[in-house]
């Protein structure tokens, strides 16, 4: 099974991917569940990730092509081999983030993004959880308190992009709304509980 987590920066998707991995590992064993992420997932990709995040003035198409090349490396070295071994793969970001950020956010043709993605991978996730959170809240969590209007507009476009992706892929995409209610009275993460319930029904 291939499970992905999506959402804008600061949505809490990384936390949820770790929590679900811990949950599944208790059921299926730690050796049968793989947690990975994009961009990254391999030693080479992690090094390139650091360079990309430090890069100044990289145009959006160049950035997209880097991400696509990194996805090929990640898919062939980590994701596909793990799935072939019948392991569960939990991935923090995948193709939907590319569509939302580079497509809806930066204005690159979404059809081009999908065509490039189809060149480098031959399968899509079985289940995708999109953690939805208010843009102002997400930027606050990301410590971007000094954000400008242009940045705010960008994240609204990205968030709307995720909505569109979910609408077009109801068979695999599930929106999990984060109403800023992190834990219940027993200290259990409420978003995690929502995710587990959806997973149990699939």
Curated annotation (Swiss-Prot):
InterPro entries: P-loop_NTPase (IPR027417), Thymidylate_kin-like_dom (IPR039430), Thymidylate_kin_CS (IPR018095), Thymidylate_kinase (IPR018094). GO terms for biological process: dTDP biosynthetic process; dTTP biosynthetic process; dUDP biosynthetic process. It catalyses: dTMP + ATP = dTDP + ADP. ATP binds at residues 7-14. It holds the Pfam family Thymidylate_kin. HAMAP family: Thymidylate_kinase (MF_00165). It comes from Ehrlichia canis (strain Jake). This is Thymidylate kinase. GO terms for cellular component: cytosol. Phosphorylation of dTMP to form dTDP in both de novo and salvage pathways of dTTP synthesis. The gene is tmk. The keyword Nucleotide-binding applies. Its EC number is 2.7.4.9. Keywords: ATP-binding, Kinase, Nucleotide biosynthesis, Nucleotide-binding, Transferase. It comes from the Bacteria.
């Amino acid at each position: 099974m291939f499970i992905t987590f999506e959402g804008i920066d600061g949505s809490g998707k990384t936390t949820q991917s770790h929590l679900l991995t811990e949950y599944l590992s208790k059921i299926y064993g730690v050796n049968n569940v793989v947690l990975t992420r994009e961009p990254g997932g391999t030693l080479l990709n992690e090094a390139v990730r650091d360079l990309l995040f430090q890069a100044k003035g990289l145009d959006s198409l160049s950035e997209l092509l880097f991400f696509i090349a990194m996805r090929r490396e990640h898919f062939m070295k980590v994701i596909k081999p793990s799935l072939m071994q019948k392991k569960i793969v939990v991935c923090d970001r995948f193709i939907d983030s590319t569509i939302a950020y580079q497509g809806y956010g930066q204005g690159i043709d979404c059809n081009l993004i999908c065509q490039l993605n189809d060149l480098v991978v031959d399968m899509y996730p079985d289940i995708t959880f999109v953690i939805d959170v208010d843009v102002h809240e997400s930027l606050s969590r990301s410590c971007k308190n000094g954000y400008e209007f242009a940045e705010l507009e960008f994240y609204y476009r990205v968030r709307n992009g995720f909505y569109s992706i979910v609408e077009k892929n109801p068979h695999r995409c599930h929106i999990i709304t984060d109403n800023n209610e992190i834990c219940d009275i027993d200290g259990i993460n409420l978003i995690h509980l929502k995710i587990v319930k959806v997973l149990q029904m699939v």
